[in-house]
């Protein structure tokens, strides 16, 4: 069953917010009226995950300019997120919120949980200001994602959201610069 055009299920989780308050709670109420990206990854202290999170950190300011809040999500605790971010040069520059899904609520609701392992699949969800999933992508364990492509998808989703009678064809972003 597709999750496209489905409203996200209410949630409340603990989180680590680097460089600010350290530990916070985040719920569905916190994202109302905002564009959000939920960026699921299997685990902290791994190999592909820090490359993706660092790439996302490089784009964080650009996403903020679009009014998009980034949430990385794994089934690790918020304490583990903090320890990893503070001990890894690769992800030291992260400033977006790292959600702890140690109770598996988000992974279950977004249908990305690998129950036998207690880990989330590598998946990305773009959620509009009404809490509706506009796009998602899931890849196998060894395939990293590209923040530049995610940025293009977010811009396309925002464009279609604001212009419901229009579409975004392939290479849409590069076409608008011609």
How would you describe each model-predicted region?
Residues 1-176:
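Chalcogenol-based redox active-site neighborhoods
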